[in-house]
């Protein structure tokens, strides 16, 4: 159910007309987007296309968190930035563009690195839990921290990754106790050597981040608008070099130190 007394304005009806015409997508779905609050961690190769699509689709509140500055090497794939933006904060620069793309929604940017100590404040938990976290970061250690925050505060987490010509995507719902990021990638997170493979040293094709960022946005729109998880206990694996995509099932790890820990769950 959407929140009471929420309606679409004439401008919103015109802007989202093609979306509302979709089979299986009605006015209630669009209204759910309007009342949704999404926090995106990482305003880079994944965060740029994901945030732009969500903003264009009508997600009512989009908050970007990133502590990095724009570099020349980012321009190849980070679609919200221009050469004149080099050395500017990613989060604030991206939000300025997003606000121009859709002035009918609320966009916020914070220059900070999200961690377990500042999560309550940065996620504005005093105002209530966000409806969805989007992990658009680029290393296992940071993703594991975001996962711990997701489990701690019981916030759904949509995690994407992209490197070279490959990508992965999963949507974890800690409130359903069906497993978390650590259940799937725990062994990799604990392997420091694996964390060294990043876009900076392994490369990434521009289209890879565009595809994965928009697949991430697609899953977010279905989750927020249609209240369904298209990836329940499934990891989507995309291989751009072979133009192949497959789904791999996973289960909750009963020994997971994150989502199976009574200490974490009770915080």
Where are the language model's segments positioned?
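Adenine nucleotide-associated cytosolic modules
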Residues: 1-267
């Amino acid at each position: 159910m959407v929140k009471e007394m929420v309606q679409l304005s004439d401008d919103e009806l015109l802007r989202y007309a093609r979306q509302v015409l979709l089979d299986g997508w009605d006015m209630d779905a669009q209204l759910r987007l309007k009342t949704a609050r999404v926090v995106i961690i990482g305003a880079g190769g994944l965060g740029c296309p994901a945030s732009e699509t969500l903003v264009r689709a009508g997600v009512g509140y989009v908050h970007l968190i990133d502590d990095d500055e724009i570099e020349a090497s980012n321009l190849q794939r980070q679609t919200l930035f221009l050469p004149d933006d080099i050395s500017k904060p990613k989060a604030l620069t991206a939000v300025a563009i997003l606000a121009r793309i859709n002035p009918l929604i609320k966009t916020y940017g914070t220059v900070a690195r999200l961690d377990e100590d500042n999560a309550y404040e940065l996620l504005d938990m005093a105002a209530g839990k966000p409806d969805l976290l989007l992990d658009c970061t680029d290393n296992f250690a940071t993703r594991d921290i975001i996962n711990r925050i997701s489990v701690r505060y019981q916030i759904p987490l949509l995690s994407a990754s992209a490197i070279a010509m490959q990508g992965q995507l999963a949507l974890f719902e800690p409130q359903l106790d069906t497993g978390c990021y650590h259940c799937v990638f725990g062994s990799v997170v604990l392997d420091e050597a694996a964390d060294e493979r990043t876009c900076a040293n392994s490369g990434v094709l521009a289209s890879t981040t565009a595809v994965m960022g928009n697949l991430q946005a697609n899953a977010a729109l279905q989750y927020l608008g249609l209240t369904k998880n298209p990836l329940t206990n499934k990891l989507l694996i995309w291989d751009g070099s072979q133009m192949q995509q497959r789904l791999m099932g996973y289960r909750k790890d009963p020994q997971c130190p994150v989502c199976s820990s009574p200490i974490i769950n009770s915080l």
